[in-house]
Amino acid sequence: MDIYQDTQQVLINNSETCYKDFVTKLIPNCSNILGVRIPFLRKIANKICQNNWQSYISHNPIFLEETLLQAIIIGKKSQNISDFNNIKNFIPKITNWAICDTFCSSLKFIKNNKDYCLIFLKPYLSSSKEFELRFGLVILLNYFIEEKYLPLIFKTLDSFKNNQYYAQMAAAWLLSSCFIKFPNRTLIYLKKSQLDKTTYNKSIQKIIESQQVDRSFHPLLKSMKQ
């Protein structure tokens, strides 16, 4: 058996029906779930990273967990600009929010390659495809919420024109995260933003629901809903 087939059998052997049922409820329209927990996937990823990991990520995955495993492996093995090619090749495999968000959170090397990353992200931040756009927005959320990047984030959000749910939720999540760290700057942006009504209201709601936002902002935020 090769590394892909061998790993697939390990995943099947460590799947849990109850966890599969739980994940199925969280990820609509995803029928290829085994029910393997993320900590176990990370453990398997560590082993694959010591062997022929390039071969493993080259396969077209069948199960959700195989895609998540590839995402984690790419994150672990990415160290410099040349590794953005693996990221580019993986992005078409992002078909739901769980793959997207797991992948983005795994790409920690971006912290040291921000300038190049912004160039790389440009086509995704203007993409009409739901999960390409979500990928770009969640990368901004994970690695670029700093004062010097706020103008870029706000400009990106003002050009946001997408009515697909998971893209809109990513935009709202990004804006609420900006508010947590920079409430006054983000409040100024909200008052003059060009966001569509749905994304704007989702952003306000996520800010209000956050436990990290001072409740003193709530009356004003509620009054700003459209």
Question: Which residues make up each language-model segment?
Answer:
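Alpha-helical scaffold domains
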Residues: 1-226
